[in-house]
């Protein structure tokens, strides 16, 4: 049994060192869910969508707004503040902390229905995050248009979580908007795979784009699903990009640079 487990883990994460695998196993054990992700090179994105049999006309439109200081103080502290408009579903918000260690989180926090601990695993690494999710307390578009305080979008519990982990002296209302990013989301269950796959296409203002394929699973099945997913995608000629960029980091960097350029031009 141990040999089978070892083979499965090796197939799921061949680029990770032994000490990383040990760390990953510990994080997965304490998480609520695992999301397996890979991004695809720009030149192969269209063929990847076609190979999975997903219909772009069924894509859901999203606008993702990030908030940080102009020099990304939150990102350096491991805090992400996001508000999102979702076609047909309404607006939602999240305050995220990463990386986290599940044993370090309080039982009260773990019991809250809006708090989720998830491991994001890519071909080249992984991170465990704690996300405080909520429904936007005001319509995002209206709130931003009239210049309402940013804190008004977030629940009392989200604001408290932010205050606990944000850099000292940086309040929610001190943050600037970075975005929004236009996102298309497609999802489906390929017959030969038997699990739901999600494709997100993030379109950046400079014409660059990231296409990410992902699937979620329970922690107990993470390595088995990772191995099966790797095989399924490989059989369809879908390979992970050598440079696995994260969507959020690229968005924050892009808009931070844009703010700096605008400031320097004044």
Task: Annotate each predicted stretch with a short phrase.
Residues 2-266:
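Phosphate-end processing signature that detects enzymes handling 5′-triphosphorylated RNA
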């Amino acid at each position: 049994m141990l040999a089978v487990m070892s083979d499965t883990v090796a197939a799921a994460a061949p680029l990770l060192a032994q000490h990383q695998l040990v760390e990953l196993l510990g994080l997965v054990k304490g998480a609520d869910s695992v999301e397996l992700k890979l991004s695809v090179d720009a030149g192969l994105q269209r063929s990847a969508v076609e190979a999975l049999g997903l219909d772009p006309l069924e894509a859901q439109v999203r606008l993702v707004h990030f908030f940080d200081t102009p020099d990304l103080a939150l990102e350096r502290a491991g805090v992400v503040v996001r508000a999102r408009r979702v076609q047909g579903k309404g607006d939602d918000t999240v305050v995220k902390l990463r990386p986290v260690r599940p044993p370090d989180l309080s039982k009260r926090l773990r019991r809250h229905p809006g708090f989720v601990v998830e491991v994001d695993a890519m071909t080249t690494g992984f991170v465990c995050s704690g996300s405080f999710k909520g429904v936007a307390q005001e319509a995002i578009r209206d709130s931003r248009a009239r210049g309402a305080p940013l804190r008004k979008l977030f629940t009392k519990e989200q604001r408290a979580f932010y205050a606990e982990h944000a850099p000292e002296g940086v309040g929610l209302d001190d943050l600037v908007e970075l975005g929004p990013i236009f996102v298309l989301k497609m999802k489906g269950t390929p017959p030969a795979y038997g699990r739901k796959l999600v494709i997100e296409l993030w379109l950046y203002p400079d014409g660059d784009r990231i296409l990410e394929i992902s699937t979620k699973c329970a922690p107990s099945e993470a390595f088995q699903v990772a191995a099966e997913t790797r095989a399924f995608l490989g059989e369809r000629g879908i390979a992970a990009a050598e440079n696995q960029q994260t969507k959020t980091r690229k968005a924050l960097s892009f808009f931070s640079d844009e703010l700096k350029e605008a400031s320097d031009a004044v």
